[in-house]
């Protein structure tokens, strides 16, 4: 009879959310991450969007306990992350900013160190990534461009059978061709329906291309969280002349950009009756962010 392994194991039959966050908060002197909650199911990509300083990195670092949150609970693979951090990390692929570890070491040396930490290291997968990303293992880390450092970090993350990738601004610094290639890899990664990705970005076109869900953070608070198509479908851009700006319409607009001839504003689909007779157009994530942030009409006092 074979020995029974009593170590903590992932029960895929019982697991529903691959990642679940409840009430995550973290306060600093001039910033407060306030009650962040969300759930990510297997097989999906969640894009985490917000302007610089909105709280994306603080959320991710608090989730991973790189900074200690004030309160909140994080579950990954059905396990409490704080209580089972080592076990959870075996199934995580993490890329946080530019890869600057072991700057004077060659890539093959760094890889030799990293692979020892992962029992499920997949050398064949690593070789495929190295080839696909056109990485030269004889180069030193400090010799790589910012984009190539991101590719190398992703090659490591994709090579140990991770079930969840958590990526902070992974496409920043990549040229358009490399960025599009990376988004293709994201879609391939979740195609089996068992793996998921949470990635933060300020490049809204990335979300249009590959995100199933959008989580939008502003000033430390989650403003929107849901299916990408449903979020986009919930808003319209409305255009009109100066005489068309009625008190009812002004009250309904989320944000407005005035021009010499009139205005363009963002309005919720449910409030479209206030824009009756005016020209409207579909919104996208970029316009929703722009009119919510830059052209915000109803700002808090």
Question: Where are the regions that the model predicts?
Answer:
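Conserved beta-strand
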Residues: 21-24, 31-41, 72
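Walker A (P-loop) phosphate-binding loop of ABC-type ATPase nucleotide-binding domains
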Residues: 50-55
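Helix-to-loop junction immediately C-terminal to a conserved catalytic motif
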Residues: 64
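Conserved ABC transporter NBD signature motif
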Residues: 72-80, 87-88
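ABC-family P-loop ATPase nucleotide-binding domains
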Residues: 86, 90, 96-152
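Catalytic Walker B motif of ABC-type/P-loop ATPase nucleotide-binding domains
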Residues: 165-169
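Short loop immediately C-terminal to the Walker-B catalytic DE motif
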Residues: 171-172, 204
